[in-house]
Amino acid sequence: MQIVRALPDIAKTRTEFETYTLQWVGMEDIAVPLTLNIGGGKQQSLPAKANVYVSLDDAAEKGIHMSRLHAILNQLASQVCDKEGLDLLLRNMVASQGKISRSAKVELVFDLLLPKPSLLSNETGFQTYRIEIGGQCLSEKYDYSLKITVPYSSTCPCSAALSRQLFSDAIDNEFSTSRIDKQELLSWALTSTVATPHSQRSYAYLNLLLGNHGWPSLSSFIMQIEEAIGTPVQTMVKRTDEQEFARLNADNLMFCEDAARNVKTLLEQSSWIEDYWFKVEHQESLHAHNAVVIDQKYSKGAML
């Protein structure tokens, strides 16, 4: 006959350390599958990493019940991850700790995979965007945040002007007479690369505070960001798409300040955003350093 013995649980013993409350105790980097509404009536299932925390408000308690938090987090695998679902998750996290916790926090980090059509050729590729959804319940008050990283292309206006000057000088050197044959000029232009403006892959990092509001369609909002900047990076391209991409960059020459103002205009027009912090980063191909702009709506230290 097998004897069933009770397993020791030292967490129930009183702490031998100083009795202090602790703001956040939990686990980080937990794997969990998510299902998200991405817009247009579509859903996407994807792998994510989660950080979960609760407050330890009973100073006499040795620690929290971590396995209970893990079990509650696993429930996300069988439901759509939206504000209502995270409200319930946070409430259950607090309740799972008995009376030793009054607050809970969750952070979900994942790569959203979206189809991206080519500019002209009707081809389609796929692009990932790093997303972080954060939620917390403080004394039954809910607050949410959304972090998004969006890459784009930027071409320097100063470099473009310098390149145009060199091209003008080359025409002057090549054609010495005051009258130039149009066809001869066109033929020369097609075979003569005098100078090219420098451009680079750039990034917009957005940290948005939503208050007690849900987030919009992620795919639609990402598209709005890309349209505001004007030069989104591409996936699958053919020569006609690459040429159109070159035209877009010429039509949207920008310093980092220009990109930042375009982003800020969009954020200011988005009524569902209560506060924001953002950074645009141009990873210079001319310089060995990056050009950046950092801005925020309100001067809140938590956003820095």
UniProtKB/Swiss-Prot annotation:
Q: Which residues form a coiled coil?
A: none
Please state the Enzyme Commission number of this protein: 3.5.4.16
Would you kindly state one Gene Ontology biological process term found in this protein's UniProt entry? tetrahydrofolate biosynthetic process
Give the GO molecular function terms: GTP cyclohydrolase I activity
Name its pathway.
Cofactor biosynthesis; 7,8-dihydroneopterin triphosphate biosynthesis; 7,8-dihydroneopterin triphosphate from GTP: step 1/1
Query: Keyword set for this entry?
Result: Hydrolase
What broad class of enzyme is this?
hydrolase
Q: Does the keyword Cell membrane apply?
A: no
Q: What is this protein called?
A: GTP cyclohydrolase FolE2
**Family affiliation:** Belongs to the GTP cyclohydrolase IV family.
Give the protein's function: Converts GTP to 7,8-dihydroneopterin triphosphate.
Fetch the InterPro entries from UniProt.
Answer: GTP_cyclohydrolase_FolE2, GTP_cyclohydrolase_FolE2/MptA
Q: Is Hydrolase there in the keyword field?
A: yes
Question: In this chain's numbering, which residues are marked as the site (May be catalytically important)?
Answer: 156
Report the catalytic activity: GTP + H2O = 7,8-dihydroneopterin 3'-triphosphate + formate + H(+)
